[in-house]
Design a protein with these regions (language model features):
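Conserved acetyl-CoA pyrophosphate-binding loop and the N-cap/start of the following alpha-helix
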Residues: 94, 98-106
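A short, internal acetyl-CoA/4′-phosphopantetheine-binding micro-motif in the GNAT/acyltransferase core
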Residues: 84-95, 119-120
Length: 139
């Protein structure tokens, strides 16, 4: 007889903290993987550029950024300003484990009452997280 040990990611500690310059390389990795996934879901792959080459790179780093860290590795991040949620990305293997929600919960107190964000209509997973935090869809 043998035993199988199953270790879930959520048993590992998820730390949400402010971005540091030393996170840059890992943040780029998260962005590049998750952005491609987002664009595949949104059927807009032609818009992809790695963060190093993205026209919005300067804008992203001018925002407030928090990272999600597991075992000293950045697995997600959120970037926002007072009235706009600009970017929220989590590595695929960590999605569906509440990390995006924790990042969003960190940002919400800083957002003005009427903040906005943009999401592809086909990105159902993101829309569920946003609506669970009180965001409503406007057309």
């Amino acid at each position: 007889m043998f035993q199988i040990e199953i270790r879930l990611v959520m048993s590992e500690e998820v730390i949400i903290r402010k971005y540091k310059n030393t996170d840059y390389v890992q943040l780029c990795e998260v962005h590049d993987e998750a952005r491609m996934q987002e664009l595949i879901v949104g059927n807009a792959v032609e818009l992809y550029a790695p963060l190093e080459e993205a026209i919005y790179k300067e804008e992203l780093f001018s925002e407030t950024i928090y990272v999600a860290e597991v075992n000293s590795h950045v697995v997600g991040f959120i970037a926002f300003r007072k009235n706009e949620l600009g970017y929220i990305y989590v590595l695929k293997e960590y999605q569906g484990k509440g990390i995006g929600g924790k990042l969003l919960d960190t940002a919400i107190p800083y957002l003005k009452r009427r903040a906005f964000l943009e999401v592809f209509p086909t990105n159902i997973r993101a829309k569920v997280v946003y609506s669970s935090r009180g965001f409503v869809e406007e057309t």
